[in-house]
Amino acid sequence: MKSSRIAAVLCVVAFCLAFAAQAMATKYVALGDSYSSGTGTRTFYEPSCQRSVYAYPYLLHEAHTSWTFVNATCSGATTASLLASQVSSVTSDTNWVTYTIGGNDAGFSHVITECALPSWASNCSGAINEAQTIIKNTLPGRLDTVNNEIKSRAPSAKVIVLDYPRLFNGEDCNAFTFFSSSEEARLNETADLMKSVISAAATRAGANFTFRDVIPAFIGHAVCDGGSGSSTEWISGLSNPTGESYHPKVAGHANGYYPAVHGVTG
């Protein structure tokens, strides 16, 4: 009888310890657009959203294999689609959240497509002006909505908010694009504007939100740095398929984005 009681007690203790361990498990949720899913790396384990094992969320997962990892990122995501189909992955037991968002709200793809055309066939300046107006006047409120929704779902979660790199170095080495140096400068200025808006929104969100700037890491590694397709170039220029264009390559995630998030999570 005594041995059976001891066995019962041990079973209860083991159950409690297992339950406690499960309750304390760290949960990491990755949200965001193509700069988080891994478009540009050319290798996807979930093709419909272009989620890659080479993207920074997966690299962070590999550094913390004991964590529960939920990858809700999806290429093409906007603030609206993040709220509609991604943020539900954030639950009260979430410990870490990362995201990039806002580029598609500003019409990033349209702007790049317009500015890549010859000057006589495009309205690059108008496209940039329109994007900058959205970034300044519309995006702040949308980012606040995203951040408030994350906070309401996981009040204790630590949230790492990332920006977008400057794409260009002042030259165009691709055969079928026609970016002028002045257009590249304005596009880089738009990345800087995006940075300031994203950073300000993260600050407004409170102490649990940390903004990480990736722009410095990509200096010297923009499109055409070292020549098209070189190892120095961490961002793809015009690519085939075209959807891979103007996104971080494997090296951009490994050396640009991943250190930014890992520097916070450890």
Kindly give the residue locations of the regions a language model identified.
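Bacterial N-terminal signal peptides that target proteins for export
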Residues: 1-9
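Serine-esterase "nucleophile elbow" of acetyl-processing enzymes
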Residues: 24-73, 88, 117
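Structural recognition of the beta-strand scaffold that forms the well-ordered cores
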Residues: 27-38, 68-73, 95-100, 105-107, ...
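Oxyanion-hole/transition-state-stabilizing segment in secreted/luminal serine hydrolases
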Residues: 39, 81-135, 166-168
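A structural motif corresponding to the C-terminal end of an alpha-helix
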Residues: 61-67, 141-160, 193-212
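Catalytic His-Asp segment of secreted/periplasmic serine-dependent ester chemistry enzymes
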Residues: 165-266
